[in-house]
Swiss-Prot record:
It comes from the Eukaryota. This is Lipoyl synthase, mitochondrial. It comes from Candida tropicalis (strain ATCC MYA-3404 / T1). [4Fe-4S] cluster 1 binds at residues 98, 103, 109, 343. GO terms for molecular function: 4 iron, 4 sulfur cluster binding; lipoate synthase activity; metal ion binding. The lineage of its organism: Eukaryota, Fungi, Dikarya, Ascomycota, Saccharomycotina. Keywords: 4Fe-4S, Iron, Iron-sulfur, Metal-binding, Mitochondrion, S-adenosyl-L-methionine, Transferase.
Length: 377
């Protein structure tokens, strides 16, 4: 006979047995604590979570009473000069990085006196083939073909404005065989034909690492060759388009200098991505090793919610520190401040003076010892 054993033995104290096997509760982790501080399920249902997760700059755009670092506040663009520059830009069908990149200094640069008002013209259209996580310029794999009249129109606009110094920048055009290098060179040549006295700075791309294209632009007649590193080496893969590398950008600046040693070479760094002091120092050393003359520091400001969040709003005092540090390392000129941008005009007067002295072979130009703070903060 088969004996049948009950499935459950009622004599066993089930509850007590389960209780004795319960492990002690784990300590809360840092992640859990931070998660509990954030929005709850009810916040998401009510719609409050969205506001709880926005950074101060985003909130300030919606709520005038929200806290925003005072050094990041700028005046509303207005004035006769501002509207005149805007009119010329529209009439000649030009693009400007001032508008496309939502530059905070547009009211100062466009709204200055006639001798000071300027716009940084963006060549090769208003659409980039790359998609860096900090940039608000439109992107597309196949932008419209470059306007063949753009070099002539650009030269005409610059002649109208009566400038002594002009900055040209460009979108990346990986869809073009030469990356747009010859178009940029032609624009510089047209400007020099119409107004030989004008000093020209070009903020160019990396041409996919084709250094022959760098040489074409360097030999076009420009006076300042600028190419931006944007950030430190460790953060580059997370911030810039994957086709742009830190070492490739250094190679561009180095080749430009070797091609024409009289050129002033220039680059810019944005702070606020979470970079460390050690990483910034390493970047400055790398730049000095390749003979880069000018560096600028500015605060990264998130253009839209689709872009990288700001990790830190760097104080004006910290920007002063990096200005002094870079000057001590031997840079010819340094512009450093929350609202400074790569094409910001704060340094142009000094660079213009340096270049004019070089044109007239007036010995060695001494390095600038003191740089005035930009008036925008």
């Amino acid at each position: 006979m088969i004996s049948r054993t009950p499935l459950f033995r009622t004599s066993i104290p089930i509850q007590r047995t389960l209780a004795t096997n319960v492990k002690p509760r784990r300590k809360r982790t840092v992640f859990t604590d931070e998660l509990n501080k954030g929005p709850s399920f009810e916040d998401f249902v009510s719609g409050k979570a969205k506001d709880m997760m926005e950074d101060p700059l985003e909130l300030a755009r919606k709520d005038p009473n929200a806290k925003l670092p005072k050094w990041l506040k700028v005046p509303i663009p207005k004035g006769k000069s501002f509207h005149n520059v805007k009119k010329d830009v529209r009439e000649l069908k030009l693009s400007t990085v001032c508008e496309e990149a939502k530059c905070p200094n547009i009211s100062e640069c466009w709204g200055g006196k006639k001798s000071e008002a300027t716009a940084t013209i963006m060549l090769l259209g208003d659409t980039c083939t790359r998609g860096c996580r900090f940039c608000s310029v439109k992107t597309n794999r196949k932008p419209a073909a470059p306007d063949p009249n753009e070099p002539e129109n650009t030269a005409e606009a610059i002649k109208r404005w009566g400038l002594g110094y002009v900055v040209l920048t460009t979108v990346d055009r990986d869809d073009l065989v030469d990356g747009g290098a010859r178009h940029l060179a032609e624009t510089v040549e047209k400007i020099k034909q119409k107004a030989p006295q004008i000093l020209v700075e070009v903020l160019g791309g990396d041409f996919r690492g084709d250094l022959d294209m760098v040489e074409i632009l360097a030999n076009s007649g420009l006076d300042v060759y600028a190419h931006n590193l944007e950030t430190v080496e460790d953060l580059t893969p997370h911030i810039r388009d994957r086709r742009a590398t830190y070492r490739q950008s250094l190679a561009v600046l180095e080749r430009a200098k070797k091609t024409k040693p009289s050129l002033v070479t220039k680059t810019s760094l944005m702070l606020g991505f979470g970079e460390t002091d050690e990483q910034i120092m390493k970047t400055l050393k790398d730049l000095r090793e390749i003979g880069c003359d000018v560096v600028t520091f500015g605060q990264y400001m998130r253009p839209t919610k689709r872009h990288m969040k700001v990790v830190e709003y760097v104080t004006p005092e910290k920007f002063d520190y990096w200005r002094d540090t870079a000057l001590d390392m031997g840079f010819l000129y340094v512009a450093s401040g929350p609202l400074v941008r790569s094409s910001y005009k704060a340094g142009e007067a000094f660079i213009e003076n340096v270049l004019k002295k070089r044109r007239h072979n007036v010995g060695e130009t001494p390095r600038l010892q003191s740089v005035a703070k930009p008036s925008v903060y």
